[in-house]
Protein backbone atom coordinates (compact mmCIF):
# COMPACT_ATOMS: atom_id res chain seq x y z
CA UNK A 1 0.00 0.00 0.00
CA UNK A 2 1.17 3.50 -0.83
CA UNK A 3 0.39 4.59 2.72
CA UNK A 4 2.80 2.08 4.19
CA UNK A 5 5.52 2.36 1.55
CA UNK A 6 7.45 5.28 3.09
CA UNK A 7 7.04 3.90 6.57
CA UNK A 8 8.33 0.48 5.53
CA UNK A 9 11.38 1.76 3.65
CA UNK A 10 12.23 4.02 6.60
CA UNK A 11 12.70 0.89 8.74
CA UNK A 12 15.65 -0.29 6.65
CA UNK A 13 19.17 1.16 6.65
CA UNK A 14 19.45 3.76 3.86
CA UNK A 15 22.02 1.80 1.82
CA UNK A 16 19.56 -1.09 1.47
CA UNK A 17 16.77 1.06 0.00
CA UNK A 18 18.84 3.61 -1.93
CA UNK A 19 17.76 2.13 -5.27
CA UNK A 20 14.02 2.40 -4.48
CA UNK A 21 11.89 5.43 -5.36
CA UNK A 22 11.58 7.76 -2.35
CA UNK A 23 7.83 7.83 -2.63
CA UNK A 24 5.22 6.38 -4.91
CA UNK A 25 2.34 8.74 -4.12
CA UNK A 26 2.04 10.07 -7.67
CA UNK A 27 2.82 6.81 -9.41
CA UNK A 28 0.46 4.17 -10.65
CA UNK A 29 1.62 0.97 -9.04
CA UNK A 30 1.46 -2.25 -11.01
CA UNK A 31 1.85 -4.42 -7.92
CA UNK A 32 3.38 -4.22 -4.50
CA UNK A 33 4.56 -6.75 -1.99
CA UNK A 34 5.74 -4.87 1.04
CA UNK A 35 6.43 -6.61 4.31
CA UNK A 36 7.18 -4.86 7.58
CA UNK A 37 10.51 -6.16 8.88
CA UNK A 38 9.89 -8.88 11.42
CA UNK A 39 11.63 -11.98 12.61
CA UNK A 40 11.33 -15.52 11.27
CA UNK A 41 10.39 -14.51 7.72
CA UNK A 42 12.26 -13.15 4.75
CA UNK A 43 11.90 -9.37 4.77
CA UNK A 44 11.21 -8.10 1.32
CA UNK A 45 10.02 -5.28 -0.86
CA UNK A 46 8.88 -6.00 -4.41
CA UNK A 47 7.57 -2.91 -6.15
CA UNK A 48 6.30 -2.94 -9.74
CA UNK A 49 5.82 0.36 -11.54
CA UNK A 50 4.96 1.19 -15.13
CA UNK A 51 7.98 2.32 -17.12
CA UNK A 52 7.79 4.28 -20.38
CA UNK A 53 10.37 3.97 -23.16
CA UNK A 54 12.45 7.02 -22.17
CA UNK A 55 12.60 6.01 -18.49
CA UNK A 56 13.42 2.45 -19.55
CA UNK A 57 16.37 3.61 -21.67
CA UNK A 58 17.68 5.80 -18.84
CA UNK A 59 17.43 2.89 -16.40
CA UNK A 60 19.17 0.52 -18.84
CA UNK A 61 22.14 2.88 -19.14
CA UNK A 62 22.34 3.52 -15.38
CA UNK A 63 22.05 -0.17 -14.55
CA UNK A 64 24.64 -1.23 -17.13
CA UNK A 65 27.25 0.79 -15.21
CA UNK A 66 25.99 0.14 -11.66
CA UNK A 67 24.95 -3.52 -11.66
CA UNK A 68 27.19 -6.21 -10.20
CA UNK A 69 25.45 -8.65 -12.51
CA UNK A 70 22.99 -8.62 -15.40
CA UNK A 71 20.96 -11.81 -15.80
CA UNK A 72 18.00 -13.47 -17.41
CA UNK A 73 15.90 -15.82 -15.31
CA UNK A 74 17.07 -18.84 -17.30
CA UNK A 75 20.72 -18.15 -16.44
CA UNK A 76 22.63 -20.20 -13.88
CA UNK A 77 22.05 -18.15 -10.75
CA UNK A 78 21.68 -18.61 -7.04
CA UNK A 79 17.90 -18.22 -6.66
CA UNK A 80 16.21 -17.48 -3.34
CA UNK A 81 14.12 -20.64 -2.84
CA UNK A 82 11.37 -18.90 -0.94
CA UNK A 83 7.58 -18.98 -1.15
CA UNK A 84 6.49 -15.47 -0.15
CA UNK A 85 2.81 -16.33 0.23
CA UNK A 86 3.32 -19.22 2.64
CA UNK A 87 6.58 -18.04 4.24
CA UNK A 88 8.25 -21.34 3.41
CA UNK A 89 11.47 -22.56 1.88
CA UNK A 90 10.95 -24.50 -1.35
CA UNK A 91 13.22 -27.47 -0.72
CA UNK A 92 13.48 -28.61 -4.36
CA UNK A 93 14.70 -25.13 -5.36
CA UNK A 94 17.12 -25.12 -2.45
CA UNK A 95 18.73 -28.34 -3.69
CA UNK A 96 18.93 -26.97 -7.26
CA UNK A 97 21.05 -24.07 -5.92
CA UNK A 98 24.00 -26.19 -4.78
CA UNK A 99 26.11 -25.77 -7.96
CA UNK A 100 25.71 -21.97 -7.84
CA UNK A 101 27.00 -21.36 -4.33
CA UNK A 102 29.66 -18.93 -5.58
CA UNK A 103 27.19 -16.61 -7.33
CA UNK A 104 25.16 -13.76 -5.83
CA UNK A 105 21.51 -14.51 -4.99
CA UNK A 106 18.50 -13.08 -6.82
CA UNK A 107 14.77 -13.49 -6.16
CA UNK A 108 12.77 -16.19 -7.91
CA UNK A 109 9.92 -13.86 -8.93
CA UNK A 110 7.54 -16.82 -8.85
CA UNK A 111 4.46 -14.56 -8.78
CA UNK A 112 5.33 -13.52 -12.36
CA UNK A 113 5.55 -17.10 -13.59
CA UNK A 114 2.98 -17.91 -16.28
CA UNK A 115 -0.35 -16.17 -15.74
CA UNK A 116 -0.73 -12.70 -17.23
CA UNK A 117 2.94 -12.53 -18.29
CA UNK A 118 3.79 -15.91 -19.87
CA UNK A 119 7.03 -14.64 -21.45
CA UNK A 120 8.36 -12.97 -18.28
CA UNK A 121 10.94 -15.70 -17.65
CA UNK A 122 12.23 -15.40 -21.23
CA UNK A 123 12.32 -11.62 -21.64
CA UNK A 124 12.89 -10.02 -18.23
CA UNK A 125 16.37 -8.57 -17.62
CA UNK A 126 17.62 -8.64 -14.04
CA UNK A 127 20.03 -6.00 -12.76
CA UNK A 128 21.59 -7.16 -9.52
CA UNK A 129 22.81 -4.01 -7.78
CA UNK A 130 24.21 -5.64 -4.67
CA UNK A 131 24.12 -8.72 -2.49
CA UNK A 132 26.11 -9.41 0.64
CA UNK A 133 26.38 -12.08 3.29
CA UNK A 134 25.86 -11.03 6.90
CA UNK A 135 23.41 -9.41 9.27
CA UNK A 136 21.95 -6.13 8.07
CA UNK A 137 18.90 -5.88 10.33
CA UNK A 138 18.55 -6.42 14.08
CA UNK A 139 18.39 -10.09 15.11
CA UNK A 140 14.69 -9.87 15.96
CA UNK A 141 14.00 -8.83 12.33
CA UNK A 142 15.97 -11.65 10.70
CA UNK A 143 14.78 -15.05 9.60
CA UNK A 144 15.90 -17.53 12.20
CA UNK A 145 16.81 -20.42 9.89
CA UNK A 146 17.93 -18.67 6.73
CA UNK A 147 15.87 -18.88 3.57
CA UNK A 148 17.05 -22.12 2.02
CA UNK A 149 20.30 -20.80 0.56
CA UNK A 150 23.65 -22.53 1.17
CA UNK A 151 25.08 -22.10 4.69
CA UNK A 152 27.36 -19.26 3.60
CA UNK A 153 24.20 -17.22 2.99
CA UNK A 154 22.35 -17.96 6.24
CA UNK A 155 21.87 -14.17 6.52
CA UNK A 156 22.31 -11.48 3.89
CA UNK A 157 20.53 -9.29 1.39
CA UNK A 158 20.01 -8.87 -2.33
CA UNK A 159 18.72 -5.80 -4.14
CA UNK A 160 18.19 -4.64 -7.68
CA UNK A 161 15.63 -4.18 -10.38
CA UNK A 162 14.10 -6.01 -13.30
CA UNK A 163 13.11 -4.47 -16.61
CA UNK A 164 10.30 -6.25 -18.39
CA UNK A 165 8.38 -4.71 -21.27
CA UNK A 166 6.83 -1.55 -19.83
CA UNK A 167 7.47 -2.37 -16.16
CA UNK A 168 10.26 -1.95 -13.69
CA UNK A 169 10.30 -4.25 -10.67
CA UNK A 170 12.40 -3.03 -7.76
CA UNK A 171 13.41 -5.55 -5.12
CA UNK A 172 15.07 -5.77 -1.75
CA UNK A 173 15.24 -8.99 0.21
CA UNK A 174 16.89 -9.27 3.62
CA UNK A 175 17.13 -12.43 5.69
Q: Residue spans of the language-model regions?
A:
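Surface-exposed acidic loop/strand-edge motifs in secreted or periplasmic proteins
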Residues: 2-124
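Short linear interaction motifs
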Residues: 128-153
Amino acid sequence: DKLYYREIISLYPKFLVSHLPENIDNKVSGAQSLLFPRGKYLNYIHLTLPCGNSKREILKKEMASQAKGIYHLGDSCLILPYDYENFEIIKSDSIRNLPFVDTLPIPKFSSWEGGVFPDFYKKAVIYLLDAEKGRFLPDDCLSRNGVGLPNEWVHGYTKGLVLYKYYVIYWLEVW
